[in-house]
Amino acid sequence: MDFHLIIKSAWEGYDSSKTIRDIEDISAMVSTNHVYRITFHDEDIIIAKLSFFGKFEHFKEDHRIIQSLSNNLLYPFENLLSKSLLKNNRVYVYRYKHGKDDAWVVFYNPTRMLDRLPRRLNNEQIKKLGTQLGKFHKACSRVKNVLPKSSKTLRTDIYDLQRQLEKNPDKFGNADLIKHHCEQFLKNRSRYNMKSFEIIPVFIDWNIGNFSVTPDLDLYSRWDYDWFRMSYRLLDFYFFSRVVSDAGDRTVFSYVIGPMMEERFITFLKEYHEVNPITADEIRFLKEAYRFFILNYVIKDGKYFFNEQYAKKLQTEAVEIYLPSVDRDFDAEVIIKALKLE
């Protein structure tokens, strides 16, 4: 696919009176999604995101939800998210179809950035981040009823993985282990009082490279919406456990479960709990949120979200390390006791 040609076609469909001078690839090198900085002859700049994975309907649906969220979040988060460019009062999403090629483009206003967090946080920074996420989740909860509906659920994604395993048992390696964990996830969903869990917008992949903070460590801006979905707030927690972990946020990374059992993560959760209380059942479900993340984002869709080198490494580790550790290495009761939930 000629990505530059697709971007140019997308822009012509948006506003052919304004001409592109330069298209610069600013994509994260670990991902297969493509992000471009577009400079026009009049010096204006916008960002374009091009994707060719999954379903066009989901891509369009997600960006319409994100745009609605961006418009409806109140102070102090009213400018946290990038605004998509609109045409005729709707998010402009361009679809390119030619033979087997199928790609989609959305345009954004550039995101303003302030400070990045350090690779390894100190105790005060961990506490502040816990408070900030608690407040942000609360703000997302307040606008959830005015957002467009989402068709994706955790269950439908796991069903999709099960179908792929039935069709081609050798596709991901160790089909029996993966099937077992799919069944465990579906079975364990009913063990917790999940009807009481709120469904809010979540971004899942939080790392020090995709959000910025003010000098006082308030959340300032967030970009990169690849894993956005409407789901349980718990899906955000694993990635924050990595951000606050003793090892710190790393360039070469793995998705081990260990950071969720660290004292540093418990410190983070205590501060979160102060502003946005968590239930014991939600803490118990953290294990299932992690299991879902490995099954869906690493095994099922890893080859689309990561470049080939990372995808192979992470999928091998998923079968050999991550999944075997789920029921062995995570003890929710330690966190429940620390938070005095029971």
How does the language model describe each region?
Residues H4-D15, N145, Q162-I204, T214:
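An alpha-helical support segment within catalytic cores of ATP-dependent transferases
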Residues S31-F40, I47-A48, K187-L235:
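Active-site acidic catalytic loop and adjacent metal/ATP-binding pocket
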Residues H41-V143:
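ATP-binding pocket architecture of kinase catalytic cores
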Residues D101-R119, L161-D170, F292-Q309:
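A glycine-centered beta->alpha junction motif in the catalytic cores
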Residues L235-N276, R291-E308:
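Active-site activation/catalytic loop segments of kinase-like enzymes and analogous catalytic loops
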Residues N296-E342:
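ATP/Mg2+ or Mg2+-diphosphate-binding catalytic cores
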